[in-house]
């Protein structure tokens, strides 16, 4: 099993505001699709509800304490330990509580750094490059649909 974080955050580590992304960046959505298609996304219930439906062509797993939660096309787990039973490449997809719980346990992180400061009420936990090696850093292309500077980072935990 490979365990990765997949997240976009701004320069203040904001990941959300009122259960929505504070920015619109189609490049990042394509990046998420490219990385996670054919694999497993694990997210909390609030993150799933902000998306509104299972993402196609990948396994969608929702971690929730709500034993009555049931959505077609979604597998439900009720504990962090259940994540370790999932096969293949598993991406931790948010939100804040799940990221806080898993950041010290993942092998690597795929981070889209949004080069701006946005209003937010949900944050990615602090991390330092002392703990992570930069495997790749690619500037996102700007165009009429992608107007916010952004960088795609792949960080691997230092041994």
Swiss-Prot record:
Q: Per the UniProt entry, what species is this protein from, by scientific name?
A: Staphylococcus aureus (strain MSSA476)
Indicate what this protein is called per its UniProt record.
Dihydrofolate reductase
Q: Where does this protein act, in terms of pathway?
A: Cofactor biosynthesis; tetrahydrofolate biosynthesis; 5,6,7,8-tetrahydrofolate from 7,8-dihydrofolate: step 1/1
Q: What does this protein do?
A: Key enzyme in folate metabolism. Catalyzes an essential reaction for de novo glycine and purine synthesis, and for DNA precursor synthesis.
Q: Name one GO biological process term.
A: tetrahydrofolate biosynthetic process
Does Nucleus count among this protein's keywords?
no
What is an example of a GO molecular function annotated in this UniProt entry? NADP binding
InterPro entries, sorted: DHFR (IPR012259), DHFR-like_dom_sf (IPR024072), DHFR_CS (IPR017925), DHFR_dom (IPR001796)
Q: Does the keyword Phosphoprotein apply?
A: no
Reaction(s) catalysed by this chain's protein: (6S)-5,6,7,8-tetrahydrofolate + NADP(+) = 7,8-dihydrofolate + NADPH + H(+)
The family this protein is said to belong to: Belongs to the dihydrofolate reductase family.
Stretches of the chain forming a coiled coil according to its record: none
- The EC number(s) attached to this protein equal 1.5.1.3
């Amino acid at each position: 099993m490979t365990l990765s974080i997949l997240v976009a955050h701004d320069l203040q580590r904001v990941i959300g505001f009122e259960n929505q992304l504070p920015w619109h960046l189609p490049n990042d959505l394509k990046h998420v699709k490219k990385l996670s298609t054919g694999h497993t996304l694990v997210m909390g219930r609030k993150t799933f509800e902000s998306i509104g439906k299972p993402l196609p062509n990948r396994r969608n797993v929702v971690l929730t304490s709500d034993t009555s939660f049931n959505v077609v096309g979604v597998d439900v787990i009720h504990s962090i330990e259940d994540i370790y039973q999932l096969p293949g490449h598993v991406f931790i997809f948010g939100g804040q509580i799940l990221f806080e719980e898993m950041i010290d346990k993942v092998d690597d992180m795929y981070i889209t750094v949004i080069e701006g400061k946005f209003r937010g009420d949900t944050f990615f936990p602090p991390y330092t490059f002392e703990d992570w090696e930069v495997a790749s850093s690619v500037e996102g292309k700007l165009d009429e649909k992608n107007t916010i500077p952004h960088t795609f980072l792949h960080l691997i935990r230092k041994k």
